[in-house]
Amino acid sequence: VDYIEHVTDEFREIYDIVKHTKPYTGLKVAILNAWGRLRTWQAHMVAHELPYKQIYSYLGIMEALSGASVDVSFISFDDIINDGVPEGVDVIINAGDAGTSFSGGEVWKNETLITRIREFVYNGGGFVGVGEPTAVHHQGRFFQLGDILGVEREMGYSLSTDKYFTKELKEHFIIEDIEDVHKIDFGENIKNVYGLTSATEVLEFSNPKVSAGGVEEGIVLPANAEGKEFGEIHLAANPYGKGRGVYIAGLPYTPENTRLLMRALFYAANKESELTKWYASNPLVEVHAYPEKGVYAIVNNTNELQSTLVYDGAGVSRTVELEPSEIRWEKIS
């Protein structure tokens, strides 16, 4: 009874503060699929709260964005074909398995669609693809916007073509918070993804194998007789004109994957310096600011004590200690 009283009081406090106002957001992100606004905040199937092998690798995107300091909209392929990329969008996300309404399937043969997205990115926008984005067999390509993402998927038609670009970058903005990139959870993974050019920034390259304990770990197998590595890219970035593309093989929900996605979005948008505004260095802690109300909340998402650097709207940090599950409200100075 005491705990229920605590939770309801906490809810009332949150509602009294956030009603009739909007939180600070550092980016405007558009999720691109066939549905657009018709399925706003609806995931890859109806019973999405259940663990399905075919969709869990994408559910972390929605979960991460729902609590992130980004303004999210949902747009359809027809929206872009008819009207172009909406004004103000910083980054487009296209995520899903090939042939689904979420990835797009045959629509990626539409030249108006791919031309307008290329123009958007070339002029400074960002494009993040997860799983099999922009995927359809057409004109010798599978990922139709592989030139933006910097990667392509080998489908058996170019096995004799050497795949040279396998060397991982040891330092990069996207993986700055990650101790071991080979322990990132990419879910079901996408096989046989390779780098297209030397400009592709390979951030994770491995051949996932299941260990004796049943835990999938990224392992690069020994080179074969020709010196090639048996593996594939699961995380990469790529420059495209003034903009950037980012490829992620899959994104199940974890606090670490939430941080990975945020870094990928800010990197794709060329707004790395904006990340550390109303931000916590600890991925288990969130910061939500409400400038119109002059307050911000620091949230401990765990049942354990947490310590973190908290950054204000000017990017100035200080150390904060939080009790388990604590929500701490403070005034914006």
Predicted feature residues:
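The substrate-binding groove and active-site-proximal loops of carbohydrate-active enzymes
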Residues: V1, V46-Y52, N94-K109, L251
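Generic beta-sheet signal
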Residues: V130-G131, E204, I248
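Short acidic/histidine-rich motifs immediately flanking catalytic phosphotransfer sites
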Residues: V85-I92
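A glycine-rich, often tryptophan-bearing local segment used as a flexible ligand/cofactor-contacting loop or short
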Residues: G104-G187
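Hydrophobic targeting/anchoring helices
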Residues: V1-G60, Y157-T161, I184-N189, P222-E226, ...
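Catalytic beta-strand/loop cores that center a nucleophilic Ser/Cys/Thr
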Residues: W41, Y157, D162-G241, P252-R259, ...
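A short, well-structured beta->alpha microelement
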Residues: A64-G84
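C-terminal beta-strand-rich structural cap/linker in extracellular carbohydrate-active enzymes
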Residues: T319-S333
